[in-house]
Amino acid sequence: MRFGPVPPRAAVGAILAHSEDLGDRRLRKGKRLTEEDTAALAAAGRRQVVVARLEPGDLHEDTAADRLAAAICGDGIAPQGPSATGRVNLRAAGPGVLVADSARVGALNRVDPMLTLATLPPFRRLAASEMVGTVKVISYGVAADSVARAEAAGQGALRLARPVLATATLIETRVGPDTPPDKGRRAMRARLAALGLSLSPRVVVAHDTDAVAEALAAAQGELVLILTASATSDIHDTAPEGLRRAGGTVAQFGMPVDPGNLLFLGAVSGRPVIGLPGCARSPALNGADWVLDRVACGLPVGPEEIAAMGLGGLLKESPARGRPRAD
């Protein structure tokens, strides 16, 4: 691509690099100039105009952006096209979790500085039609060879992991005779609804190992959540022991995400079980969101995945927290 100033009469067929205000009309940057346009520029006293002119083997920015967007989009991600000014936004076809291949995204962005892809962070919960990324071709034209290499590098880099579960049961425990406020249940219902999961009728039991075990055995949801009246402080505390007594297993206790440290993860009768930290009573983002989203969408969540959550795991502190970090 050639770029630079030329006399207006020499700019026919070139791409205008900067918008020009001619009084009675405005020529927007990116416009392919016609004879009428260049005559108007000359009549307005412009001696030179900055343009871009594609050379053999170059692709226009919009063509390049459309091709890249089509290559990047995997299952459940679609380009919102066609391109305008070298940009195509990518959107989710439904609720779920963004699965991004960081190696492919990086490889695409290293092909040519003029070819770029920006995305949301991997594993972000998505709503239907939410923007997950944007392709931007920075220059007005780019070598077709670079576009082909970027297409190959970024092939299928983004996809949507859709929910694979439809129902959940939340088991709450109480200390004493009083039923706990429904703040935690409301927060969890909203999280589940964002992924299309429904919550079964309320279950509140005594904060006791046997009571938790019985509730687990009776739970109807494909996913079981436990929110205890007293925080789980050890892998052998009330809720994890209740899970074992129900015939289940505990795969993980604790996570390097704050708020959210006191989460545990296990299974019973082939169903995932998440022991929620107290911060899950707040709608604010916490570590339980990251685990819940992946579990609901059928993505692996084990010790390796949870350990990796520590990078970026210092989240905004919940206003509901009893003891702030600074204390």
Predicted feature locations:
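Residue-level recognition of short, solvent-exposed, well-ordered loop/turn junctions
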Residues: 28, 34, 121-128, 258
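Solvent-exposed alpha-helices and their adjacent loops that cap or buttress functional pockets
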Residues: 9, 13, 42, 80-83, ...
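Generic secondary-structure signature for well-ordered alpha-helical cores
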Residues: 43-47, 70-77, 128-131, 137, ...
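Flexible, glycine/charged-enriched surface loops at secondary-structure junctions
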Residues: 50-52, 77-83, 142-144, 198-202, ...
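Phosphate-binding glycine-rich loops and their immediate beta-loop-alpha structural context
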Residues: 138-224
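Extended, charged alpha/beta regions that create polyanion-binding interfaces
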Residues: 55-163
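Short glycine/threonine-rich loop/turn motifs
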Residues: 200-327
